[in-house]
Amino acid sequence: LRAQIGYGGMPRHRGGPIGLVDNVLNRDFAPKAPNQVWVTDITYIRTYEGWLFLAAVMDLYSRQIVGWATAPTMTRDLVLQALLAALWKRKPGPGVLVHSDQGSHFTSDDWQAFLKAHHMVPSMSRRGNCHDNAVAESFFSALKKERIKRRIYPNRATAASDVFDYIEMFYNPIRRHGSAGGVSPVEFERRNEQGGN
């Protein structure tokens, strides 16, 4: 019954990782300016229609979620859509470091080609070391504790709408972060942009 409503086992990648790269980030979670380091990851949200997968891209400088996407299945396209949203929103120069775990979506040829085409530098956590991507995972933890609270949404559209509300109406513009001087990510960037001019 669980498989019929989309709650089968979590998809697993068979075979060894193919596109592994070094851990360039090396837990340096404090870049000096925006668009130097982005971290990305995927989580899942329960609905009565089955899973809703969320891919998010965070700028480590301010902890702002700069790109995100949702989908009913966990595919390479999901992570590419989130990264494309970040590129569209931020329009960074070349050389942005994009850090992820070693999931098959991030080791895929499509992901690596996308990064190369947009002059981005790939970085990956070491295998089995969740602390290497701890900041991205802490965002998902906050989302689940502060908004989802173990609820099961009636459908994927409702869940996606709530994710939008949390990220765009609360997390980025309002939620305070100790790493951002006790202000929201949007406010942190605004203050530092004014201070730099």
PLM regions: where:
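Charged DNA-binding/catalytic regions of mobile-element recombinases
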Residues: 1-197
